[in-house]
């Protein structure tokens, strides 16, 4: 399985190098000296200043190069802009163009002040051709102001799990405010793409090759072509977004699916002019490494639950003074036992029973005592609660007198 996947991606990237010149001119002329052998070892000599390869299913980082370093990320910002817009406003909303939106620098659609567009149409302009003016129009519609939309972006980034992301502009143009410079990290950017590909509308937009739309009166019509060249060079590409500014350099984030495995690659600072092609060779190395080395494995292990001492516990009159024990119960389904995670050869999931050696009475049946936890590289990946299989009463004068009274009269 590993070797088949590796050959598939290597063949695809080889075709990419041979045909890309006809797709987007100079940007995709990948040097013929790129090593096309399967990536077995961890990628080395990446061009990107910061990079991450993530398991799109679990969110686990499989490889990183300075993945937590904050850097400018240019138009890859638009992935989050698109998602926040999709989640906050319906696609048939009318978006009115402001002077601020119309005056944005290239790359832009050429919006004019006062024009109206459907939000959905502008999202295609945003993601397919990375137009800066449509990003501002979308931001002002969804967040009232660019600043308001930036707060929405940063709030969403935190909800997704980003640790060091601060977005100031919806289009990713370099900017700075009282919170610092516009930035993210490779790991955060991968998390954002991992979240985005769960949205079916986002996937549909990202995979559309060509799209035509008009402003609402029909006076002007536009056609946009998807600039994510990887879509035409490899099967299984789910989404991708390029970016460039003078501070960020060339950036890229993509998601790719092969034989049920989903990988997310993010690259920051991946060369400056004239090195537009660096992002493609780095992407190839990371995807090859993931496809070749990682496969899904079940990780369920039968837990060992030892007896738990119940202090001050009592079961009946005959056992007064004896130690009382109980066992925990962990309920799992057949689906739980078949759960899988991407593992590299030599990696193993560790199962730990995290319950106390003793508890104090009273204990109620079904009371949570602890958990069965599964760890990979010291990080918790799954857990199941452990409950008391029966109740244990606490011995006391009241309990004793009630038992004596009950036994005497019955």
Map each language-model feature to its residues.
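Sec-dependent N-terminal signal peptides of Gram-positive bacterial secreted proteins and lipoproteins
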Residues: 2-22
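Active-site-adjacent loops and short helices of periplasmic peptidoglycan-processing enzymes
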Residues: 21-200
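Domain-terminus/edge residues, biased toward the C-terminal soluble/receptor-binding domains
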Residues: 180-410
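An N-terminal domain-start capping segment
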Residues: 2, 78, 390-391
């Amino acid at each position: 399985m590993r070797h088949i996947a590796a050959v598939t991606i290597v063949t695809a990237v080889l075709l990419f190098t041979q045909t890309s010149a006809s797709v987007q001119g100079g940007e995709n002329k990948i040097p013929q000296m790129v090593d096309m052998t399967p990536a077995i070892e961890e990628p080395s000599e990446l061009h990107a200043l910061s990079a991450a390869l993530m398991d799109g299913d679990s969110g686990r980082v499989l490889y990183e190069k300075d993945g937590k370093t904050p850097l400018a990320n240019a138009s890859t910002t638009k992935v989050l802009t698109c998602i926040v817009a999709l989640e906050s406003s319906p696609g048939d909303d009318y978006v009115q163009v402001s002077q601020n939106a119309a005056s944005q620098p290239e790359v832009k659609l050429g919006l004019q002040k006062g024009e109206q567009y459907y939000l959905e149409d502008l999202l295609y302009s945003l993601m397919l051709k990375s137009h800066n003016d449509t990003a501002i129009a979308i931001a002002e519609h969804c967040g009232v102001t660019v600043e308001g939309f930036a707060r929405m972006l940063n709030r969403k980034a935190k909800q997704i799990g980003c640790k060091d992301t601060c977005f100031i502009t919806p289009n990713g143009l370099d900017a700075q405010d009282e919170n610092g410079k516009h930035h993210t990290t490779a790991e955060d950017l991968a998390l954002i793409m991992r979240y985005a590909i769960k949205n079916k509308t986002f996937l549909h937009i990202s995979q559309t090759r060509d799209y035509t739309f008009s402003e609402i009166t029909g006076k002007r019509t536009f056609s946009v072509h998807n600039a994510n060249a990887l879509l035409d060079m490899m099967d299984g590409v789910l989404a991708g977004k390029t970016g460039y500014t003078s501070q960020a350099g060339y950036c890229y984030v993509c998601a790719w699916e092969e034989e049920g495995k989903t990988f997310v690659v993010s690259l920051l600072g991946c060369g400056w002019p004239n090195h537009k092609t660096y992002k493609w060779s780095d992407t190839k190395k990371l995807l090859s490494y993931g496809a070749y080395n990682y496969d899904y494995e079940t990780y369920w292990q039968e837990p060992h639950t030892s007896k738990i001492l119940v202090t001050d516990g009592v079961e009946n009159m005959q056992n007064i003074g004896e130690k009382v024990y109980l066992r925990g119960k962990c309920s799992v389904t057949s689906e739980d036992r078949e759960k899988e995670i991407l593992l590299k050869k030599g990696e193993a999931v560790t199962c730990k029973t995290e319950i106390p050696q003793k508890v104090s009475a009273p204990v109620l049946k079904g009371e949570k005592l602890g958990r069965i936890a599964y760890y990979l590289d010291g990080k918790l990946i799954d857990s199941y609660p452990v409950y008391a299989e029966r109740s244990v009463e606490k011995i006391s004068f009241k309990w004793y007198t009630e038992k004596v009274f009950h036994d005497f009269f019955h």
